[in-house]
């Protein structure tokens, strides 16, 4: 074979001038025949099914002009299009006859059919046959003979008017109805490339739901297309005289698919999943059309065949092997493929109607998109090395597959490009029963048969015009061929009836198919973009799509079932509106959707106007009261930054219970990590980190963040006790371990455990946030959080995994923007979804803060919909978080964590937002259900409750219990209808009821029973008095319990009195423990003035008393006494200034010896971090940041004891200056031969991200022209929300910013 002969053949093509190209695109119509325009190829213009193939030329544009009658094709080279008027004049006049009036819409014109004599013969032949498919074809032909003709046959306007006037009104109405029904009967299909890319059953069901909603009839599912992503339970294949075992075939196909693309979301659908999917679609009235493509697009099957021992199954063209196409000369490979198709067809038999066998793009990857020409070449260039009788073998192969499919009662379908390629019918005939999915009219050098020829050959046509194509990931103009904008424009300009390459004829179609392809299977699937494509296609062809009746059905279902609760007048209006919906025409199209929508709106209006009867009104109010009480009322405590003792947390639980809260949200991991399990062994990265090592590392990490003098971490025993204690008070506990931000302690711990560089690094190294590219760090953190989830599983209901404020300290609060810029946002979504899945696997409800979810209201990635969103902020300038409305549209529910209610310990008004007074004010101003950035009730989104938050951004700030209780009380008092009344007294009384009620009088038991029955457990704080009355009644009934009378009268002389067992009763009695008042003199206060330093709180002692009643005499015995509430002594400062020297006798007063204050300075040693520098000579080091020791001031009270010794007591410890970490670079560059690698290391250059002062564009530029992001740095406002992760000591920078803002009269809110 000579190379030049290959070249001679490969360049065989025709072209027309540039003017024709421009005209073709301008008119958006097909202007040339098969030997048409050769477009300029660009690298971003792949084919329909394959990235590497050539794009469509102008000849692919479909026709919207009037069409000629189907005639035998006359020889021609180039067909040009003239204006419509000229074309009408030049059309053949073989069938002119008076015509009835036709619609002038493009869709109606396209529906016109003019059969040829060949078609009539086909119709007559089909009329004699009995198969349902052929009956359908007969009906089509009949329709062709009686429906509207082309524009050339229209009579003049006056003749049209006369003809219309002569027709009876009923006849005209029937014809219009028949036209509507014909259009609605067409198939409207959405195609999903589930062969290249894995789609989960849930995703496919969502697509089916949308298809139903928009009026589609079918889902076309390519399960075999390059990849093979559907596996039967039994995959045993018998071919070539042997049987390939099922498990062997499964393993081979799974490997073959993974070799094509190893999709992280899954490999394939199972048989049970497919069966469920088909049934689900059937219930929705949607058919399913499966595709297993061959002989091309078989990458996975070819790889599988090689795994199973079939040699050389791939087609080869002059030494270049096709990765996707089977060699039709390889009998073993062909036999195996046919057996496989037979296996799948047998499964789909009686489940579906149509089976697509593919047949497109033969070996385009090995022949430069000349596969069909190569197969036909031997006939015209014999003995030159082309496949002998290649095209004849392809026809035989296609017909064999059609026969296999039909043997299972299915209709075969195939793509058009290989059928009668180059309009050459001399090689043989294709089975006429193959439905042709007409997707392309070809392009320069890709000369497919016209749809006219295919129709003449008796094939039904499914219009799959590639003008409507969308390739996943190509979401806008400039992102490659078949991008979404291109598809939407194609839909706008190309109606469903515009078939590719008609050559001027009207082509009857069975329907239209819009397609989404996965040429790049790693590209993200965006449901909203697919649904946009589907919606536009339905709207553009509204007359063909059924109207949405589901919304009407839903509106009917939402009518209250019990209408007896409403007034007769309002019920009558509802019934009339219901009747109007039920009487709607059942064959309305999407174009008539307004008729349905108006009826629905009327029904909804009448339902909203239903008026309750007085009795029902009371019931409804009671129901609403219960619904409000069912909302979560949560108090959040930042126990990750600051250490809280078990006793402090119990007292918070007590107060929460008293006020009617439902839960305590405990951030145990938030910058610091202040909860350690007994066993902290972590297995990750192929190794096990010992428990003691992990504990030590976490403690050191937490202390490095803040060494709290009150303690470092809660133990497992303490947290277990806290959970049980809260449970006894009807309080739930919601744990939070925050990541990948707010991980200061964990990051230090990982480094100490040998995990290098776990921190994110942008403008600088983040102290708070993990690097999502560091797989070792990610694996460790997931294992650690999984450990905590294991502990809380079964003990709590919700687990918060955080995910807020990514690397705000290293990006000027632009972390999410940076993630998107560096294309790491998908990694974040994957990480968040993994944590959500881990929580669900353990029976926990996953929760997260809202920051990172769908940043900027964009669905660039997909997040787990089951996550409960703790919504605290819409963001601020430059921090564009998703709106609550957008998240609600994604199906999320919220725990309202409105930042208006935030209090940061120690915060003062001059510090910014988050101070106590403002938080207390906002509990009265911001409604319970009002989410940040919205107004309630105008915006009423689905919330499960609300959360009040206490933050410890400055962990050294003093915790004052009374402040927290004041804020908790204010929140409860301003939302009394949501907060449960104080049931503590009721719990105590219920605990007093004897477990054994035998021996008490019937009357007293009945009174007790009545008191218990009257109890209402759904009273809110507005009805505390009602509850107190119920408790008093129960208490009185308990006190009224009396022993039953066992006999009456006197005993007989022989009668023995019955033995009555007298049992003691256990009661509890509480007494108050008064607090002491401790007075301390303060020389700085005026004489006689007092100042309460610590408010006194009375304690409580509970006595457990045994009460024994015998012969009417009651004896009480105290069994035990316990202090159940500790006393807090009141500390009061009393003014006692010294105003003079000497008293009236001239003597100086004797002063009380008071303790003195001793301040001692302590040095805090700096830590050293070592980083490798590939640009520095090996063995050399250089200090990048010089370490500076910090200073801690310790305040001691020094007093003298009675024996004269000094007693020193630590009063407080304050870090006066933080230590500065020393960063040292160690060189790794080798400059000589003979090192371990034999050459010098090559330094990796990383882009430095800088944020200039000017605003950044709203969307990032294309990759090839990428510049550094220019988002503005955030400014600071007076409403400073908690720094949930930023400790920035750059005082000069802050001062400079504030000075600049002061010049504009601005202040900035910094919400962390």
Curated annotation (Swiss-Prot):
Residues of the region (Catalytic domain 1) are 176-616
- Bias (Polar residues) occurs at 38-59
Q: How does it sit in the membrane?
A: Peptidoglycan-anchor
* Keywords on record: Cell wall, Glycosidase, Hydrolase, Peptidoglycan-anchor, Repeat, Secreted, Signal
Q: Where is this motif: LPXTG sorting signal?
A: 1281-1285
* BP terms from Gene Ontology: carbohydrate metabolic process
Q: Name one Pfam family in it.
A: G5
Show the catalytic activity: Hydrolysis of terminal non-reducing N-acetyl-D-hexosamine residues in N-acetyl-beta-D-hexosaminides
* Cleavable signal peptide: 1-33
- Residue limits of the G5 domain? 1059-1138, 1150-1230
Q: What's a GO cellular component annotated to this UniProt protein?
A: extracellular region
Propeptide found at 1285-1312
Q: Name one GO molecular function term.
A: beta-N-acetylhexosaminidase activity
Give residues where Pentaglycyl murein peptidoglycan amidated threonine occurs.
Answer: 1284
Q: Which domain of life is it from?
A: Bacteria
Using the UniProt annotation, give all residue ranges assigned to the region (Catalytic domain 2).
621-1046
* Localization terms from the record: Secreted, Cell wall
Under the heading InterPro entries, the entry gives: G5_dom (IPR011098), GH20_Enzymes (IPR052764), Glyco_hydro_20_cat (IPR015883), Glycoside_hydrolase_SF (IPR017853), LPXTG_anchor (IPR019931), YSIRK_signal_dom (IPR005877)
Biased composition, class Basic and acidic residues, residue ranges: 118-177, 1277-1286
Q: Outline the segment boundaries, as ranges, of region: Disordered.
A: 38-178, 1244-1290
Q: Does the keyword Nucleus apply?
A: no
Family that this chain belongs to: Belongs to the glycosyl hydrolase 20 family.
Q: What is this protein called?
A: Beta-N-acetylhexosaminidase
Q: Which gene encodes it?
A: strH
